[in-house]
Amino acid sequence: MITPKHLVKKIKGDYRLIVVSDIHGHLDRFKVLLKKVRYIPEDYLIILGDFVEKGDQVIGTIHFVEELAKRERVFVLMGNCEWALDALLTIPELANQIPEYLKRVSSNGCIREVYHRLHLDNGHETMLGIQKQIADYLHNEIAFISHLPVT
């Protein structure tokens, strides 16, 4: 469950600021973009949310963003897609929304990936059971996402 957090940072002196949003699980494209702008650790990098779902490298993108976030000058904010992912997997009352979510979201995304990887499409699980298994599988990823600031 998400608890809203806010980030305040005061910076003195000259600096270069790179702001990226809407990566949506396209890790390869994100890495190309960072090379194209010649990102270096001395730059300030803000990832303005929506780095999950839609693409076919969502779990890898989460891990990459989490590694970047360990740097002093990288700030990651939660977007609506991260909020939705967290809510869908941590609020039991939303478990029944998983089938609709799988229909609405593109053929990719980490929920779909784990759903198929764990063979949850066999019809033998309740929606609450499916939610729990996916949440357990993505425990570390959800922990990272749920602690991101929103501003």
Language-model segment annotations:
Residues 1-64:
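N-terminal active-site segment of His-dependent metallophosphoesterases
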Residues 55, 59-62, 67-151:
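Active-site neighborhood of divalent metal-dependent phosphoester bond hydrolases
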